[in-house]
Swiss-Prot record:
Entry similarity comment: Belongs to the glutaminase PdxT/SNO family.
Residues the record lists as binding L-glutamine: G50, E51, S52, R111, I140, R141
Pfam families: SNO
Protein name, as recorded: Pyridoxal 5'-phosphate synthase subunit PdxT
Record PROSITE patterns: PDXT_SNO_1, PDXT_SNO_2
Pathway: Cofactor biosynthesis; pyridoxal 5'-phosphate biosynthesis
Catalytic residues as annotated in Swiss-Prot or TrEMBL: C82, H176, E178
GO CC list: cytosol; glutaminase complex
Annotated catalysed reactions: aldehydo-D-ribose 5-phosphate + D-glyceraldehyde 3-phosphate + L-glutamine = pyridoxal 5'-phosphate + L-glutamate + phosphate + 3 H2O + H(+); L-glutamine + H2O = L-glutamate + NH4(+)
Source organism of the structure: Streptomyces coelicolor (strain ATCC BAA-471 / A3(2) / M145)
GO molecular function, one term: pyridoxal 5'-phosphate synthase (glutamine hydrolysing) activity
Length: 202
């Protein structure tokens, strides 16, 4: 079995291309995923930024939501940025009508907590598990995590708010590392996928 993991990016809406580039730099085979049969062929999945309600509704429409929930429950590594973080939350504090989540991280998330698009900003974030300088994070109408359960590990905070969380094979950030050219968070995720593949092959 090749050591190179195949990592998908849910390609229904959002900044898909930037994630595909970041994953390729992180030595993964990166593929867009829109349908259940494409989901079945990947070792891990990125849920990109975008509009969480739209992504949720399209995931249901394309028949991806239920198989995605099942694979996350079964331990498939998954990484959500911004809207993707909201998708991985077990609970949203301020959900919009018809909004569903995949779940996977025992956390409560507040949508658009850092403000609207005109209040977007960049900030250096110390992320546990990422060596070297702080990660340059782009926050665009970003959520933050109000609280986490006992199983969830806080990896980073900004301005007193939780902005990066991991629970088992699920990773989530409020910010967009894929927009800065700093691919260390994607390397961290690719390493999670590799470790999971190795464990499954034993």
């Amino acid at each position: 079995m090749s050591d190179t993991p195949v990592i998908g990016v849910l390609a229904l809406q959002g900044d898909v291309r930037e994630h595909l580039v970041a994953l390729a730099v992180a030595d993964a085979v990166a593929r867009p995923v829109r349908r259940p049969e494409e989901l079945a062929e990947v070792d891990g999945l990125v849920l990109p930024g975008g509009e969480s309600t739209t992504i949720s509704k399209l995931a249901v429409l394309f028949g991806v939501m239920d198989p995605l929930r099942a694979r996350v429950r079964d331990g498939m590594p998954v990484y959500g940025t911004c809207a993707g973080m909201i998708m991985l939350a077990d609970k949203i504090l301020d959900p919009r009508s018809g909004q569903e989540t995949v779940g996977g991280i025992d956390m409560i998330v507040r949508r658009n907590a850092f403000g609207r698009q005109n209040e977007s900003f960049e900030a250096a974030v110390d992320v546990e598990g990422v060596e070297g300088e702080p990660v340059e994070g782009v926050f665009i109408r970003a959520p933050w995590v109000e609280s986490v359960g006992a199983a969830a590990e806080v990896l980073a905070e900004h301005d007193g708010h939780i902005v990066a969380v991991r629970q088992g094979n699920a990773l989530a950030t409020s910010f967009h590392p894929e927009l800065t050219g700093d691919h260390r968070v994607h390397r961290l995720f690719a390493d999670m996928v590799r470790a999971n593949r190795a464990a499954q092959s034993l």
